[in-house]
C-alpha cells in the first residue's frame, strides 16, 4: 500500500478515514477550534503564522477580548493594536491585520469567503488563505505549512528541497489529491496536528502515527527524520546594542520606531548598534544625537538582555542616562515622549525592552539622579 498511496483511490480513502478518526479522537481543545466565526478563525491563523500553538492561548484570548469583532479592530488605533499584540513578536502581522480589518469593515464587515478574496487582504498568504477558507467556509483548499510539508515529504518520500517551487507545487498537488472533499477544515487541521504532535522534526513518534502504514519514509529509510531535506543553517550575526533609560527629572524618554521595518510602530528605550572602535557608552551618545538631536550623559549599565530575531541576535545593554540639552526631534524615530515610569504599561514595547522593564522592576522614580 505504501508505494501506491496517490495512485489508488482505496488507499487515499483509507488514509483520509484513519487520519480524520485520529484527529477527532485526539485533537487539542483550543479556543479557536470552538468557533465557526470567520473573524476569530482569521485572527488565530494570523497568530499561528509565527507562533506555536502552545504559546498562543493567552495572547489569542487577550486580543479577541480587546477586539471582539472586525469593526472593533478596524476602529482601534495602531498603538492599541500593537499593545494588544505585545509579546507575540513579528509585529508586521498585527499591522497588516489592522489594515485588513479596515478594508473588511469598509466593505460591510464580512470577511471574504473565498481563497482568492482572502488572499487579496494585507498579510494573507497562500497558507492563511487556504486555512481560513477551508476551516471557516468549507472551501476545498489544502494547507501547506511547515508541519504539513514535513508530513507529506515523509509520506511520499520526497527527498528534494521543499523550498523549491517545483517541489512545493508537487506538495500542493498531493495535498489536493489527499484532501477529503467537504471536510477540508478538519482534514487540514488534522494534517497540521499530526505534524505538530506526532510527525515531529527531530524524533517522530511513528509508533503513534495513525497513517504510518502509508508512509514511504518509515518503510524505506532507516530514519524518517532525515526528511524533509534541511538547508544548511547560515550563521546568524550578533550585534551589541546600547539603549538609554534617559531621565529628565522624574520622567523617562521613550521613542517610537518608524511604522515600517523591524518592530515598526513599537516604543523603545532609544539607542542602536555599536560600531567598530567605539565603546557602548559612546555608541549610545552618538545614537541619541543622530536619532533625537539631544545630548546626554551616560551613566552605569543597569541591565543586559540577550534576544534573538529571525536573522540575527543581539545583546541589549540598558544604560542609565541623564538628559543634558537640546529639544528632541524625530530624526530617526516616528515620535518621542517624556513619560512617568508608571505609564510604561500603556505603550507597546518589543520583547527585549519588556525584559529590561521587568528586570528593573521598574526603577523607582526617586532613584534617577
Predicted regions mapped to residue ranges:
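A residue-level signal for conserved active-site and pocket-lining positions in enzyme catalytic cores
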Residues: 23, 47, 191, 209, ...
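The catalytic Nudix box helix
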Residues: 269-303
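NUDIX/MutT-family hydrolases
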Residues: 318-364
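Catalytic cores of DNA base-excision repair glycosylases
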Residues: 4-9, 18, 22-207, 211-220, ...
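Short, low-complexity, intrinsically disordered N-terminal peptides in bacterial proteins
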Residues: 1-14, 361-369
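Acidic, metal-coordinating catalytic segment for phosphate/diphosphate chemistry
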Residues: 208-242, 308, 315, 347-363
